[in-house]
Regions:
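A general structural signal for well-ordered alpha-helical packing
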Residues: 1-4, 21, 36-37
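Rossmann-like dinucleotide/flavin-binding elements
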Residues: 1-17, 85, 126-127
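Flexible, acidic loop-helix segments that line cofactor/substrate-binding pockets
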Residues: 12-29
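Flexible, glycine-rich terminal cap/loop adjacent to redox cofactors
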Residues: 25-36, 41-149
Length: 149
């Protein structure tokens, strides 16, 4: 809308590109919205990092013949500015990541905090549920380095 508002609506606007969701439709999909960890540390200085690698429920059933270590894995990561508790980045590797990122792009654009995500009841069983049930940060990143928690 920034283009249309600027050129046709006489309301100059600059698009906010930090909350644009993107996806790579590979198998599995890769989805991202917000800042990368390096960008978040550069901008905010101190970032709390939540991440999870897990086997989706469908793989427990569909890949039951495989050893647990051989089953498909998904990965999700949430970046949080420690000063404000604001979620500044979400990155996922999972089926349908593109679909998943659109809703979280709206949340990041609206300034969602980690506390608000923690209050959300996830739809079970979905990949999105994993993002709202990550309660324990794995590490904190600063310009000086990483501290495991």
């Amino acid at each position: 809308h920034a283009f249309a508002d600027t050129f046709y609506g006489n309301r100059a606007r600059v698009p906010d590109l930090e909350a644009v969701a993107t996806a790579v439709f590979s198998y599995p999909n890769v989805g991202t919205v917000g800042l990368t960890e390096a960008e978040a540390v550069a901008k905010y200085g101190h970032v709390r990092v939540y991440n999870s690698t897990y086997t989706p429920l469908k793989c427990h059933v569909g890949q039951a013949h495989l050893d647990i270590k051989e089953r498909s894995k998904d990965y999700m990561k949430i970046l949080v500015d420690t000063a404000t508790d604001k979620v500044v980045g979400i990155h996922v590797i999972t089926d349908n990541a593109g679909e998943l990122m659109q809703g979280f792009a709206c949340a990041i654009k609206c300034g969602v905090t980690k506390a608000q995500m923690d209050l959300t009841i996830g739809i079970h069983p979905t990949a999105a549920e994993e993002l709202v049930t990550m309660r324990t940060a794995k590490y904190e990143a600063t310009k000086e380095g990483v501290t495991k928690l």
